[in-house]
Swiss-Prot record:
Residues 1611-1625 have a biased composition (Low complexity). The lineage of its organism: Eukaryota, Fungi, Dikarya, Ascomycota, Saccharomycotina. One of its GO terms (molecular function) is transcription corepressor activity. It is found in: Nucleus; Chromosome. Its main location: nucleus. This is Histone transcription regulator 3. It comes from the Eukaryota. PANTHER family: CALCINEURIN-BINDING PROTEIN CABIN 1-RELATED (PTHR15502), CALCINEURIN-BINDING PROTEIN CABIN-1 (PTHR15502:SF7).
């Protein structure tokens, strides 16, 4: 569709007119529909009328948009919309009048509201008529909406038509309806209490004095509005009644009342209430206007026993809920774990899911169980036997055999057991009946764990301060009764009688529970009675919800509410204690506690506010209130101040004096507060003593004393003396504080453990390893004494189990701390002397925990025993950690004892112990428990013993720790179920050193076979160590600078001279850092050696990339800068650079044809040479050179000589021996003596003679060194390449002057190569050199044929020729002797080709072609040989098909390619094969990256092509364009060319002509010059056009002399003159070269 708009057209106007027309049609349609709807409404056909109205409101001009707005507005539209809404409102009203009796109340209200909605909407579009306002006024009056009724009345009065009547001009025409509305309005103003308006304003405004005294008549209601009015009155009556919530109580108890009230509110966490300071009541949807309690009779008659069981179940559920975020603590009922919370809910399907559903005989089943039990116990029997044997090696008495150990658990009942077996059987029973209670006890260790900062450690001491207070509290007799029912009954009665709001009931409940119930004595329910724990939580929840309101209330009524304030203060302090305890538990478990700390801060802030308020209320006159307040304040100080804070002592002193002065018999239990101890005079005095004692034994001195270290040592010494005196009373200790001894001796067992933990942790913090170990063994002695004490034996099973698990937890914590500090010291031995009895204690402790493993094995066959590891994953995990820690300590101390007592057998004994322990733990799948401490120590110890046994176990360790699988023929590690960890740098160094020493066993890694199985581990070790060159170490930086400076220096004669005298050095300095030992051992060197070996393998399969060498170069440089003085590293570094150079030279010629890229290769080549030079210098500087050193440096000499040759000859052409300064400009003195600046140029730093001498020196030394090595090692195989390279270089540079010496080296190389290479794949290069040298010497006349054959016969073991082959017929002429000699040379060269299995050798074939062409004149034979190397006629893209042999110099490949193409072109020119030459030209254009000097080759090939074509086809040079084309008649040319195109048949012409024309035309198209024009035009005219033109001329009139004769082939005729008698014609058009080529193109398209 066209988008063109005429200038005189108005698109918008046209659209507007169309819309206006459409709108007018819609308006007309709307009025018609409205008329139909009114007719139906008049006929009371409500269904049709309703459908009409629905149709009406679907029309756009009537229907508003989604926002209630209209797009267009006009008087007509406003009138239409008014009528539509007005009449639909009347429709709803009329419908109600006719159908109200059939409608229910809801339908009636909905319908009348629709009428109101439509009528009100109509008023927005136009002034309403009186019928609308009158109906609305009546409806509003029926709804008793006085304001709306007044509004609609005033709307009617203010209408324009009524104003004109009311202003007096037509007052007599005032209608009765309006008068009635006015009277009703007067009544409304009286109801709305607007006397001014009703008395004065309205009558003055509208002059209605005469109506003032008329009694207003009420608006008449129809039956519908009367019914609505009645419904409205009923609703108002209902709204006046209170919404009473009937709360059903299950029993008459405070906790039931509190729970019922809480259930009325939405559930909100207490932590949320603390943070948000909100009242949950604000979140309810409907207000609670009144509360009434009802007692459920059915549940009330339930026996109390059932209710008690329900309460216990509820407590269990609550504990299970708390299990997710709390850890174990010795205090019961607070903390659960999620693993043992439901010990009795193990499903049968979990137990029996693996059992086969089949029947078996009982006898068979019993026998099977016995056999399986024996198999299960085999691991224990084997361990006990091996372990006791290992103990005997270090002269330690065996612990016991397995049968003795097992007998502890199979003796009869506990009362018949020996006393020493009781702890074992108790532990066995705990495991058998493990529950959540045991988890709580076992997983607590807050009394031992030291804080990460000073405040946490002080909190630990505060816990010590509280410990006895709570123990004393628990010792109170349970004389407190539950809350009695009298108070609750009175409370329920008061609430039910008063119709109280929820706020009133809640506040009244708090006053009852927290306030006083005996005003005279200040007695409180929360102090005098024992509450349910749930009640206390709900009360606290209520307090946090309305705390700010209560605080404001109490602040206004201090005297009346003082005990309520005290109770709230106590609740907050107790809750602070709960939060602090939970923070401690989470810290112990390593969980985050930021939210809890935030709660703690907010609660502390609230407590301080209440404290300030209570300080205003409480005074010493009110003794009881004052004592309670001070005691609670003392408890608060324990959580907020240090143990040495003077406020603690001052508060206790004040309390003590007050109690003594008032009532010494004061005894308050605080039964409902967990964190507020019982209050009496003895408790206060006990707390004072504890503060003094604890301050004396506090490890950290908080004061700013300069002698704090001395005080700390004194405190530790005092505490240690007291604890040791209690542990060993017979020991005499001077200066013992008897009061402290008595206090600690009489303290509970838990406090003693905590004090030992404080002493132990203090030494740990001071990193005093000897003291830590000494205290650890004292603690083991203390624990053993506790479990064998009479108190333990006489306790009931419940008490023994609790004490036993506490001991296990303490041992586990201390063992973990000891292993941690020993690990931080890298398990180095200290001056601590381990006595035999100490080691025996450690063994006894380990085998006590061994009960767990024995039980786990017993559970396999005993149905009554459930697996502890599967049932309690968290607790069993901790148990595994403890056992691993103990085993780690045993291994550590065993290794120390073996080192002292049996140093010769230390490695064997320690390795066997690791085997035994690891096998045991691996069997139970937890050898990596306790963060892999056992594996860590085992790895460290095994790395000290370099033997195969240790390596086998180390393989197992590496799998279990890092999941490194090292395969071997005789051992494969067991795949234990462990979690792999990342290797750390501190572990990688000794492991790498160990692997190197084990792998090479003092052998030189360079000459040893590399084990690829260890490469993964070595790579990971190197990765963890990182790049040392990036370390912030000035020595490393200096060494790196010196290394880089050396690699950027030029190659000079002095450098070469110093190299072979061992005088070249970098003068590096050893960093002697943490990596020095590993570097000296060869970590980076061996890793780079392995990586380079892998690179070589990949390089052979052409899968390697030079970028892989970057990491190897980096590792070798790191090895060098650590001053390892290892010449092997320099050799490897040189090899890396050599491989980079080789890769750049062998693939494409681009990098050797572009100068910039060639400079980069030269730079790398120079680095390789420098590396080899440094390696040789280090070798010659060594005084003690081993035979291994000689073997290695022999390879370096060969590599250096080869690299020098590569840099000296093409294609590099001595570029690496030139050097350019890094500066762009240099300053020099000119001839006139002036200082001038010029661009820096490359300079050659060494002469050709010195380079050649260096090459000779390298190979000469290599040859002599080979002989020296051979004399020392008969097995050594001489290196043929040294002799070969020396002979080849000598041959090239000598010019035949020393041919005998060259021949000697060549024959030696041939002999060594023949002996060292397999017969199936022999080395070709030295044999070819011998043949080629003899050929060239004979041709140059250096030697005769007889001498040459004699030399060649020395290699007859390779050529395998008959004796007569080597005989020369001297009777022949010299030229015939040479010819026969050349034939023999060709035969030998063909033999070389025949033994080349890879078919990579191409030089012999080239030499054959060259001899055939140059010496024998056999062009076709030579061309046949070259055709096997050059594929000019094939579709293959490559022009020269040769491969680089292994020993060919990199880059020489492209030089050879150039030589072969030059020879091939010479051969083609010799036979004038221009078509083949053209094919070579076509391929040569795309073969640019396959050879050098491609432009020179192209020029040569084009010249050969054109000359060959002109000679062979006898074409004229340039005559076609300059002479023939101007003489051609244009019309005649078109005619003959067209005829030629029609009659052309490729088969009628020789292949050489048709193919030549096509090829010449293709070459002309692909070339921008005119080089191929003459050949293309010549073939066209001479062989196609002119023959046809001559044939056509013979058919014309031979008598017509005016027609010019056509030029003959190969001749040029003069221009023909036109006939002078002919008439003038148009100017003759000349035939152009383009037109000729267009005709050629048509013919070429037909040639296939």
């Amino acid at each position: 569709m066209s988008m063109f708009n005429a200038l005189n057209s108005n698109i918008e106007g046209e659209q507007y007119e169309a819309e206006e027309h459409s709108r007018e049609l819609q308006i007309e349609q709307s009025f018609n529909i409205l008329q139909d709807a009114l007719i139906d409404l008049k006929n009371k056909d409500f269904e049709k009328s309703d459908s009409k109205f629905q149709e009406l409101f679907q029309i756009d001009v009537v229907k508003p948009d989604r926002w209630g707005m209209y797009r267009n507005s006009s008087p007509t539209l406003d009138n239409l919309r008014y009528l539509c809404y007005r009449n639909r409102g009347m429709y709803y009203h009329l419908y109600l009048e006719n159908n109200y009796e059939r409608l229910n109340s809801q339908e009636l209200v909905n319908c009348i509201l629709k009428a109101v909605e439509n009528l009100v909407e109509s008023i927005q579009h136009s002034d309403a008529d009186f019928a609308v306002t009158d109906l609305l006024a009546r409806i509003f009056k029926s709804f008793n909406s006085v304001k709306l009724e007044r509004l609609i009345s005033e709307y009617e009065f203010t209408k324009q038509e009524n104003l004109s009547l009311l202003l007096g001009r037509h007052r007599k025409f005032l209608l009765n309806d309006l008068t009635l509305m006015m009277n009703n309005y007067v009544e409304l103003t009286n109801k709305l209490l607007v006397p001014n308006l009703s008395d004065n304003t309205i009558f003055e405004r509208y002059h209605l004095e005469k109506y003032k005294d008329i009694k207003p008549e009420p608006l008449a209601f129809g039956p519908i509005l009367s019914r609505i009015s009645e419904m409205k009155k009923q609703d108002e009556e209902i709204m006046k009644k209170l919404d009473v919530f009937n709360v059903t109580l299950n029993e008459e108890s405070w906790d039931e009342v509190a729970k019922a009230l809480k259930n009325l509110l939405p559930s909100v966490k207490t932590s949320s209430l603390i943070g948000r300071n909100m009242d949950p009541y604000n979140e309810i949807e409907e207000p609670i206007e009144a509360v009434k309690f009802e007692l459920s009779e059915a549940i009330n008659n339930t026996p109390s026993l059932d209710r008690e069981s329900e309460r216990q179940e509820e407590e269990q559920d609550n504990e299970s809920v708390r299990a997710d975020d709390k850890s174990g603590n010795l205090a019961p009922s607070d903390i659960q774990t999620n693993e043992e919370a439901r010990p009795n809910k193990r499903t049968d399907e979990h137990i029996d899911s693996t059992k086969p559903l089949q029947r078996s005989s009982k006898r068979f089943k019993e026998r099977e169980q016995e056999n399986s039990k024996e198999l299960v116990m085999d691991v224990h029997k084997r361990f006990f036997g091996e372990f006791n044997t290992l103990l005997s090696y270090i002269h330690i008495l065996p612990f016991c055999d397995f049968d003795t150990f097992a007998s502890k658990f199979i003796i009869g009942s506990s009362d018949k057991q020996p006393e020493k077996f009781i702890p074992y059987t108790d532990l066995y029973e705990c495991l058998k009946s493990w529950s959540s209670r045991y988890t709580d006890i076992f997983n607590q260790n807050d009394y031992l764990s030291s804080g990460s900062n000073e405040n946490e450690e002080l909190f630990q001491l505060n816990a010590l301060l509280k410990s006895n207070a709570f123990d004393d509290k628990e010792s109170f007799p349970r004389y407190l009764n539950d809350l009695d029912s009298d108070h609750i009954r009175s409370f329920i009665s008061e609430v039910n009688a008063g119709n109280l709001h929820f706020h009133q009931v809640r506040l009244k409940l708090l006053f009852k529970l927290l306030g006083t119930y005996d005003e005279g004595n200040g007695r409180r329910l929360i102090i005098d009675y024992l509450w349910e724990s749930q009640l206390l939580k709900i009360v606290l929840w209520f307090v946090f919800g309305i705390e700010s309101n209560i605080f404001a209330l109490i602040n206004k009524n201090k005297r009346q509410c003082k005990y309520l304030a005290l109770s709230i203060y106590e609740l907050l302090v107790n809750h602070l204690g709960n939060i602090v305890e939970e923070i401690t538990n989470k810290r112990i478990q390593g969980h985050k506690s930021a939210d809890l700390k935030s709660q703690r801060n907010k609660v502390e802030k609230r407590i301080r506010s209440w404290h300030t308020l209570l300080e205003q209320i409480a005074d010493e006159k009110d003794k009881e209130l004052y004592v309670h307040f001070q005691w609670t304040h003392y408890c608060f100080l324990q959580y907020t101040c240090d143990i040495v804070d003077s406020r603690l002592s001052e508060t206790l002193t004040s309390l003590e004096n007050t109690i003594k002065d008032s009532d010494s018999s004061l005894d308050i239990a605080y039964p409902n507060y967990r964190h507020i101890p019982a209050l009496n005079l003895n408790t206060v005095q006990s707390q004072k003593r504890k503060i003094r004692i604890i301050q004396n034994i506090t490890v950290e001195d908080i004061s700013e004393d300069t002698n704090s270290d001395t005080h700390s040592e004194n405190h530790l010494e005092t505490l240690e003396k007291v604890l040791l005196h209690i542990l060993h009373p017979s020991t005499n200790h001077s200066n013992i504080d008897e009061e402290m001894v008595s206090f600690i001796f009489n303290s509970p067992f838990l406090l003693k453990i905590r004090l030992w933990g404080v002493l132990f942790s203090s030494y740990v913090k001071k990193s005093s390893i000897q003291d830590v170990q000494r205290i650890y063994f004292h603690v083991l002695d203390f624990m053993k004494g506790a479990l064998t004490s009479p108190v333990y034996k006489e306790s009931n099973p419940h008490g023994r189990h609790q004490m036993l698990l506490t001991v296990l937890t303490a041992i586990g914590y201390l063992s973990s701390q000891l292993t941690a500090i020993l690990n931080s010291n890298r398990w180095e031995s200290s001056d601590f002397v381990l006595e035999d009895y100490m080691f025996e204690k450690l063994l006894q402790t380990f085998f006590f925990f061994y009960t767990v493993l024995f039980y786990e094995s017993s559970a396999v066959n005993d149905v009554s025993n459930k697996s502890f590891f599967k049932r309690a994953s968290k607790s069993s995990g901790k148990m595994k950690d403890i056992m691993i820690d103990l085993a780690t300590l045993i291994l550590y101390y065993y290794d120390l004892q073996a080192k002292l007592r049996t140093p010769a057998e230390q490695g064997i004994e320690t390795t066997e112990l690791i085997w035994s322990l690891h096998t045991l733990f691996g069997h139970f799948h937890f050898c990596d428990a306790s963060n892999g401490k056992f594996l860590d120590l085992a790895e460290k110890l095994l790395c000290q013993f370099i033997n195969n046994d240790s390596f086998l176990q180390l393989k197992q360790i590496l799998w279990c720790r890092y999941h490194y699988a090292i395969a071997s023929d005789n051992f494969s590690p067991d795949l234990h179920d462990t979690k792999a960890v990342e290797m750390e740098k501190i572990h990688s160094l000794p492991l790498g050193t160990y692997l190197i020493k084990l792998q090479y066993q003092n052998k030189n890694p360079y000459l040893s076979s590399s084990k690829t199985t260890l490469k993964q581990i070595m790579d990971n070790i190197i990765e963890k160590i990182g790049d040392p060159s990036t370390l912030d170490n000035h020595i490393i930086s200096r060494n790196s600078f010196l290394l880089n400076e050396y690699l950027s220096r030029p190659i000079t004669a002095d450098l070469l001279k110093h190299t072979f005298s061992g005088a070249t050095s970098l003068y590096l300095t050893s960093p002697n850092d943490e990596l020095q030992q590993g570097m000296t051992a060869g970590l980076f060197y061996v890793s780079s050696l392995q990586s380079l070996g892998l690179y070589k393998m990949r390089k052979k399969s052409m899968q390697a990339r030079p970028s892989e060498l970057d990491s190897i170069i980096r590792m070798l440089k790191n090895d060098i800068i650590y001053n390892t003085n290892r010449f092997e590293s320099w050799i490897l570094l040189g090899k890396c650079y050599s491989y980079i150079v080789e890769d750049d030279l062998i693939w494409t010629s681009d990098k050797i044809t572009v100068p910039e890229k060639k400079d980069v290769i030269a730079l790398t080549q120079r680095k390789a040479i420098l590396c080899y030079l440094m390696a040789i210098s280090i070798y010659y500087s060594k005084l003690d050179r081993t035979i291994d050193d000689k073997k290695i440096i022999l390879e370096a000499l060969d590599d250096l000589g080869s690299m020098l040759i590569s840099g000296y000859y093409n294609p590099m052409n001595k570029l690496c021996f030139s050097w350019k300064s890094s500066a762009e400009n240099t300053m020099r003195l000119s001839e006139t003596g002036e200082v001038v600046m010029e661009k820096t140029k490359k300079i050659t730093t060494i002469s050709d003679f010195n380079i050649e001498q260096s090459i000779f020196l390298c190979f000469n030394r290599a040859c002599s060194l080979s002989g020296d090595i051979k004399s020392q090692d008969d097995v050594f195989v001489l290196n043929w390449s040294s002799f070969y390279n020396l002979a080849k270089f000598f041959f090239k540079t000598d010019g035949g002057n020393n041919c005998k010496l060259v021949a000697k080296y060549i024959t030696q190389g041939c002999q060594i190569a023949y002996e060292s290479s397999p017969a199936k794949d022999p080395i070709i290069e030295p044999h070819y050199l011998l043949v080629n040298a003899c050929y060239k010497w004979v041709k140059r006349g250096v030697i005769g044929v007889n001498e040459a054959l004699t030399l060649l016969s020395k290699d007859n073991q390779f050529f395998q020729e008959q004796e007569e082959f080597w005989v020369n017929d001297e009777g022949l002429a010299w030229d015939y002797q040479e010819k026969f000699f050349f034939d023999k040379i060709i035969r030998l060269l063909r033999h070389l080709l025949s033994v080349d299995k890879k078919k990579w050798q191409h030089r012999p074939r080239y030499r054959i072609a060259r001899i055939l062409f140059d010496d024998l004149g056999d062009v076709n034979g030579a061309l046949e040989e070259m055709d096997s190397l050059i594929s000019a006629k094939s579709i293959n893209k490559n022009l020269v098909n040769i491969w680089k042999p292994d020993f060919e110099r990199p880059g020489k490949h492209f030089i050879y390619t150039y030589q072969y193409l030059v020879l091939y072109l010479d051969l083609l020119f010799a036979i004038k094969d221009f078509n083949t030459t053209g094919l070579v030209i076509k391929k040569l254009r795309r073969f640019g990256s396959g050879t050098v000097n491609v432009n020179e080759l192209l020029e040569r090939a084009i010249n050969v092509y054109t000359q060959s074509a002109k000679i062979k086809l006898q074409l004229q040079d340039k005559s076609y364009v300059e002479q023939i084309l101007p003489t051609l008649n244009y019309q005649e040319f078109l005619k003959i060319s067209e005829q030629l195109n029609q009659v052309f048949d490729q088969g009628k012409y020789p292949e050489e002509i048709s193919s030549g024309l096509k090829l010449a035309f293709q070459l002309k198209k692909g070339h921008s010059g005119i080089a191929f024009d003459s050949v293309c035009l010549g073939i066209y005219f001479e062989y196609l056009y002119f023959p046809l033109a001559r044939q056509d001329q013979s058919l014309t009139d031979v008598n017509d002399e005016n027609n010019p004769a056509l030029p003959s082939s190969g001749s040029v005729t003069s221009k023909s003159t036109p006939d002078p008698t002919s008439k003038p014609s148009a100017i003759k058009k000349r035939v152009t070269k383009k037109e000729v080529f267009d005709r050629v193109r048509l013919l070429v398209d037909k040639i296939t």
